[in-house]
């Protein structure tokens, strides 16, 4: 029982909390850096008439190369995110950097790519590092962590999708 839970929780864990209202929107499926379509009014100064208008993010279709995954990804990115990727030193560095605002603005696609990059890099998992050696304590610890991970990952369905993207799980030695 404990080893099954351990394999489920081994990787990936998503770092973003909160509810996603529209998971299939273009803002979740691409790297928009948190920017979305805004609506408002244009006001004519002389007469004070208002007209409705929409401001759309400055998005571009780009092929971005990941050095770690050795693969190109076709993504829509805003010019601001593109400048940040250049400043960070590449797509992998942009995805791996874990500032709270960056993690919130990645979107679902960004989080999936981040999980793939971290898995390929073999990043240490804090869940596995704190695993007790006693089997009874291990079971209680994993049950407690399972609830937290599922809350962080927002839903079981999304967790399963990302788990299938990562592919074969790392074999974990439970006698840590």
Swiss-Prot record:
Keywords: Cytoplasm, Mitochondrion, Ribonucleoprotein, Ribosomal protein, Transit peptide. Belongs to the bacterial ribosomal protein bL28 family. GO terms for molecular function: structural constituent of ribosome. The keyword DNA damage does not apply. It is found in: Cytoplasm; Mitochondrion. Signal peptide: none annotated. The keyword Transit peptide applies. This is Large ribosomal subunit protein bL28m. GO terms for biological process: mitochondrial translation. InterPro entries: Ribosomal_bL28, Ribosomal_bL28/bL31-like_sf, Ribosomal_bL28_sf. GO terms for cellular component: cytoplasm; mitochondrial large ribosomal subunit. Component of the mitochondrial large ribosomal subunit (mt-LSU). Mature yeast 74S mitochondrial ribosomes consist of a small (37S) and a large (54S) subunit. The 37S small subunit contains a 15S ribosomal RNA (15S mt-rRNA) and at least 32 different proteins. The 54S large subunit contains a 21S rRNA (21S mt-rRNA) and at least 45 different proteins. Pfam families: Ribosomal_L28 (PF00830). Component of the mitochondrial ribosome (mitoribosome), a dedicated translation machinery responsible for the synthesis of mitochondrial genome-encoded proteins, including at least some of the essential transmembrane subunits of the mitochondrial respiratory chain. The mitoribosomes are attached to the mitochondrial inner membrane and translation products are cotranslationally integrated into the membrane. Residues 1-8 form a transit peptide. SUPFAM superfamilies: L28p-like.
């Amino acid at each position: 029982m404990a080893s099954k839970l351990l394999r489920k929780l081994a990787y990936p864990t998503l770092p973003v909390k909160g509810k996603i209202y529209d998971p299939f929107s273009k803002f979740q499926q691409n790297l928009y850096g948190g920017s979305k379509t805004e609506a408002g009014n244009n006001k004519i100064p002389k007469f004070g008439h208002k007209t409705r208008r929409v401001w759309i993010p400055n998005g571009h279709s780009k092929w971005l190369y990941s050095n770690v995954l050795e693969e190109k990804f076709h993504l829509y990115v805003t010019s601001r995110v593109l400048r940040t990727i250049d400043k960070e030193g590449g797509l992998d560095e942009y995805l791996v950097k874990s500032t709270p605002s960056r993690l919130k603005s990645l979107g679902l696609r960004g989080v999936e790519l981040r999980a793939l990059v971290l898995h390929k890099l073999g990043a240490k998992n804090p869940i596995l590092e704190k695993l007790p050696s006693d089997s009874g304590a291990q079971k209680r610890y994993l049950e407690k962590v399972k609830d937290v991970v599922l809350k962080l990952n927002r839903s079981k369905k999304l967790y399963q999708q990302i788990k299938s993207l990562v592919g074969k799980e790392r074999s974990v030695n439970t006698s840590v």
